[in-house]
Amino acid sequence: MRFIKKYPLLNIVNSFLIDYPAPPNISYLWNFGALAAFCLGIQIVTGIFLAMFYVPSIESAFSSVQYIMRDVNYGWLIRYIHANGASFFFICVYIHVFRGLYYNSYITPRELLWNLGVTILIVMILTAFLGYVLPWGQMSFWAATVITSLFSAIPVVGEYIVIWLWGGFSVDNATLNRFFSLHYLLPFVIALLSLIHVAVLHESGSSNPLNIALSVANKVPFHPYFIFKDLLGIIFFLIVFCYAVFFKPDSIIDPINNVPANPLVTPTHIVPEWYFLPFYAILRSIPNKLGGVITLGLALIVLFLLPFITNNVFKGSFFEISKTILFWSFFSVCVLLGWIGFKPIEDPYLMLGQMLTVLYFFYFFSLAVIVPTLQAYTFKNVFAK
């Protein structure tokens, strides 16, 4: 330890991974931050290798992906790790976010920490969308066309923004090139934001299931207790991940995307990847294009506002049955929105999507208005006596 503390860079590593004081009562739900970082590392490494053989051209993109799968040594493995790694990355991050919601990890003094996490999530969504376009299959092309066309809903300047995004008057070579460039760059932006996220975490301190402030004397060092706990989580993660890669590699890939992009043939039903589906359902639940875009934006912005619109007397859902019921209702709404996003735009799915969208926002309204009112009533009529 004396050797590590002698050098400034190693001393930073020591303060982050060895001597960092962590609450002794955190559960395995706190492992998913480390698992998300592990997934990000996998994505960056496999992405670099894939970029060596990928050709960002509408004539060659699809063929280059097939070349990677068939002729590059272990190219099939690298691609399947990258494709399935994206799904597992989102699984880890979504569990991380829902854990934060359940245990109120967004309240003082962790407002900045929470908002950095939401920023990382949004950059992840953008990066994943750009990557989904790169294979240049049928679904990739039409996903790029539909999603970028949403900017045309912006009054006055919308059409100009779409042309600027495309680099022309249609989705073409310029579009694919800039999508590839950004998809290669943004994972490093996510890595930088993650480092800042961890630095802020070490400044504000980790939360815990009881969400109570603990002194340093009541905490334990990160090593060896949580290092080995995280390693155990990574081992279990790798078992499930390897099963998906080696036995179910195509389970998340839309079969239509194995067909080269054809601008003259529109798929009967455009479905994005599963991790976009809840937001996709919110987007299309509003019949008006501009209204749908605004609603989608609000669905993400409200996550930023969460630390500032809630006023909690009790610090964690652990102590409040009302917030526990609200949380699991919200979780169910998100799962159902994902299911609705997978379905065609027709009744009854359209009506259900609109109802679930209202319930999505009702959760945040409840945290801002209804829960504080119940807390004030409880304090006044129960604890005051």
From Swiss-Prot:
It comes from the Eukaryota. One of its GO terms (biological process) is mitochondrial electron transport, ubiquinol to cytochrome c. Heme b b562 binds at H82, H183. Heme b b566 binds at H96, H197. Its cofactor is heme b. Coiled coil: none annotated. Belongs to the cytochrome b family. The main subunits of complex b-c1 are: cytochrome b, cytochrome c1 and the Rieske protein. Heme 1 (or BL or b562) is low-potential and absorbs at about 562 nm, and heme 2 (or BH or b566) is high-potential and absorbs at about 566 nm. Component of the ubiquinol-cytochrome c reductase complex (complex III or cytochrome b-c1 complex) that is part of the mitochondrial respiratory chain. The b-c1 complex mediates electron transfer from ubiquinol to cytochrome c. Contributes to the generation of a proton gradient across the mitochondrial membrane that is then used for ATP synthesis. This is Cytochrome b. It comes from Acanthamoeba castellanii.
